[in-house]
């Protein structure tokens, strides 16, 4: 088949990659900043400030995926069966992916994990977007304050080393 007749990729590449295994999720849960509201919990790890952990020839998978590809951020969705049936869970996941795509510039260099609660299904997209933006800007302000304090040598409970 001639090259002129071949179809190009119809979908643009997504700007995020997903968290793949339990160890990656656990790292975000343990070292990241957390924020909760009645609809979902958001865990955020700033990968640009996080030094890559390297052991005898092993590269850090989280850090490498951001540096090697054109990936802006990493996304993890942990939707429990308590939230609802498969249709409801998939709707929530589609909405959360769409939110992060819409606000990819805010998510750049971060590893995000969403843990929706059962009330999340009843929110429309715009209310979910409002809560997401409030939480993400709050966490980013918190992380900036913690980073400034660490540079000054002040350690608080929120300034993680």
Curated annotation (Swiss-Prot):
So what does this thing catalyse? Endonucleolytic cleavage of RNA, removing 5'-extranucleotides from tRNA precursor
GO cellular component labels: ribonuclease P complex
Q: What is its EC number?
A: 3.1.26.5
Q: Name one GO molecular function term.
A: tRNA binding
Q: Which InterPro entries match?
A: Ribosomal_Su5_D2-typ_SF (IPR020568), Ribsml_uS5_D2-typ_fold_subgr (IPR014721), RNase_P (IPR000100), RNase_P_CS (IPR020539)
> PROSITE patterns this protein is in?
RIBONUCLEASE_P
What domain of life does the UniProt record list for this protein's source?
Bacteria
Keywords, ordered alphabetically: Endonuclease, Hydrolase, Nuclease, RNA-binding, tRNA processing
**A Pfam family annotated for this UniProt entry:** Ribonuclease_P
| Enzyme class at the top of the EC tree | hydrolase
Biological process, per Gene Ontology: tRNA 3'-end processing; tRNA 5'-leader removal
Subunit note: Consists of a catalytic RNA component (M1 or rnpB) and a protein subunit.
What does the function comment of this entry state? Answer: RNaseP catalyzes the removal of the 5'-leader sequence from pre-tRNA to produce the mature 5'-terminus. It can also cleave other RNA substrates such as 4.5S RNA. The protein component plays an auxiliary but essential role in vivo by binding to the 5'-leader sequence and broadening the substrate specificity of the ribozyme.
Quote the NCBIfam families the UniProt record gives. Answer: rnpA (TIGR00188)
Q: Which family does it belong to?
A: Belongs to the RnpA family.
Q: What is this protein called?
A: Ribonuclease P protein component
Query: What gene codes for this chain?
Result: rnpA
């Amino acid at each position: 088949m001639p090259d002129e007749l071949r179809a190009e990729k119809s979908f643009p590449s997504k700007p995020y990659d997903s968290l793949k295994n339990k160890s990656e999720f656990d790292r975000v849960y343990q070292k990241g900043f957390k924020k909760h509201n009645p609809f979902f919990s958001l865990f955020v790890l700033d990968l640009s400030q996080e030094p890559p952990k390297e052991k005898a020839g092993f590269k850090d998978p989280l850090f490498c995926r951001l540096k090697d590809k054109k990936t802006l951020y990493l996304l993890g969705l942990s939707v429990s069966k308590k939230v609802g049936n498969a249709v409801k869970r998939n709707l929530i996941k589609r909405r959360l992916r769409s939110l992060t795509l819409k606000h990819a510039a805010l998510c750049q260099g971060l590893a995000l994990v969403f843990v929706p609660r059962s009330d999340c299904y009843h929110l429309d997209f715009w209310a979910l977007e409002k809560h997401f933006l409030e939480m993400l800007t709050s966490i980013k302000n918190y992380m900036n304050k913690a980073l400034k304090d660490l540079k000054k040598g002040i350690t608080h409970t929120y300034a993680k080393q």
